[in-house]
């Protein structure tokens, strides 16, 4: 283990970049920039590092808090006879987006601030983190989501069950294809924003980019929720959908559950391919 290297930017990969920032970077030649090495597929060495487990715990806690706050907000809207008396769809969208903004800001320096298996999957496909770390993150995210939804149910069981438990489903008037398409496009928007906000080359050139990264990510979540809540209740996060479905545990929560895994993973894969092949053109760059 390489000792005390705990820089977890770019998906919590220990392979770091040392690049100039601010005006120094702006004056540097393009050729001075070097692509960071790709993360290995398997990195058994990580299993002996405390920073690896610390990052997983951070993902668990962040996803726990995300489900706790967001589902409570959904319940507050659903229990009211008049949506005018509540925060409404806009408030739900702000709750989800605002929590992602806050939690990414808090955990980015520890785990990379994924809080979403689709984000982790996209970063893995782009070789920003190892399979070992990706699987561990996804497991901790799902466990955190289940616990977050479970605590809400424990506090207000009657209201929780009566308001649908925040579980995702394709709403009446829409087909399964509509729901799948909404999840694919919505997750593409999110993961594409994550790649852009954490792009190493932009971070090297502009010193303000790493500081502001949580803002566009949270705002992307907000906008996607505004657009797709009427269609699927907005998943774009398999852990969020799984946690609510397991704790609510009613038949309709499982009917379309596959959509909330397949859609986000396809969207994340498309975003990763677009970033690597088109935006960064990494396969076409000279190996010299």
Curated annotation (Swiss-Prot):
Induction: By water deficit in upland rice. Expression decreased by water deficit in lowland rice. Circadian-regulation. Expression is higher during the light phase than during the dark phase. GO terms for biological process: response to water deprivation. A motif (NPA 1) lies at residues 116-118. The keyword Kinase does not apply. Pfam families: MIP. It is found in: Cell membrane. One of its GO terms (cellular component) is plasma membrane. InterPro entries: Aquaporin-like, Aquaporin_transptr, MIP, MIP_CS. The chain crosses the membrane at residues 57-77, 92-114, 135-155, 177-197, 211-231, 259-279. Keywords: Cell membrane, Membrane, Repeat, Stress response, Transmembrane, Transmembrane helix, Transport. Residues 1-30 are annotated as: Disordered. Gene3D superfamilies: Glycerol uptake facilitator protein. Coiled coil: none annotated. One of its GO terms (molecular function) is water channel activity. Belongs to the MIP/aquaporin (TC 1.A.8) family. PIP (TC 1.A.8.11) subfamily. NCBIfam families: MIP. Water channel required to facilitate the transport of water across cell membrane. Increases the capacity for root water uptake under water deficit. May play a role in drought avoidance in upland rice. PANTHER family: AQUAPORIN OR AQUAGLYCEROPORIN RELATED. Aquaporins contain two tandem repeats each containing three membrane-spanning domains and a pore-forming loop with the signature motif Asn-Pro-Ala (NPA). This is Aquaporin PIP 1-3. It comes from Oryza sativa subsp. japonica.
